[in-house]
């Protein structure tokens, strides 16, 4: 009789563990899809904007007018950058240190403010030809996208960190078409931070 109850209990534990794993995989897929759309559109708009700016530089017919428009555009970017970074301090820089601090539990990021402000400012700044890369912003956009989905799904703090790391990896993969690098990134981050 005791063996029978042990078997029933083991089956229940296995069923619970299986459903938990499946729900985590499902949440990871949702994060990957949504972050892929966010970062994919980020990358696409950067490329289109860069080609537009490049076309303005190459148009010799209206050189003086085009240079005047470009100077005004860069002034607008500087003003918008100052305004947005004053309202949201965590969009400064690459964003990777903020993501690492969030994963370690040292800070909590305002996911929505960072998502839209970093998205808009990143597109304008990188597409305009300023000396910036898309790796850091893509990782931060992915991480805050993962956090937003975790908040929407009302996940536990451990699941939230896992979805943040998954989002960061999805952002890296979408930015550079490098899924293996993203996999290594998330394994290192998750294993390093959650094994303690």
Predicted ranges, named:
Residues 1-196:
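Alpha-helical transmembrane segments and immediately membrane-proximal extracytoplasmic
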